[in-house]
A protein has these predicted regions:
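Short, surface-exposed secondary-structure boundary micro-motifs
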Residues: 9, 30, 55-56
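Residue-level recognition of beta-strand microenvironments
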Residues: 9, 13, 76-79
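Short aromatic-glycine-enriched beta-strand elements
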Residues: 15-26
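Short alpha-helix capping/helix-loop boundary micro-motifs
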Residues: 34-39
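C-terminal structural segments of small proteins and small subunits
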Residues: 51-83
């Protein structure tokens, strides 16, 4: 699992059908880190700190082992002490 900050919504109207219409968000693991695209399963907004899972756990969290995701948001962090 990773802790990431949601930066913004990603709009992609032309997608493969397997992605469906699930929201996509741009997240960053830490300030200055690489941006990644995550499937949002819970309704996050920019500025939220979230818990993300990757690999096969990301596909399962998105609802199917065949879902084409390698990063899925599974929780919003209410409070934590950032180092």
């Amino acid at each position: 699992m990773k802790i990431c900050e949601v930066e913004k919504t990603l709009v992609s109207t032309n997608r493969i059908k397997e992605l469906g219409h699930r929201p996509l968000l741009v997240v960053r693991e830490k300030a200055g880190g690489a941006r990644q695209v995550a499937v949002d399963m819970i309704g996050c907004v920019p500025g939220d700190w979230v818990i993300c899972v990757g690999s096969s756990a990301a596909r399962e969290a998105a609802g199917s082992k065949d879902y084409p995701s390698d990063l899925t948001i599974v929780g919003i962090i209410d409070h934590w002490m950032e180092e």
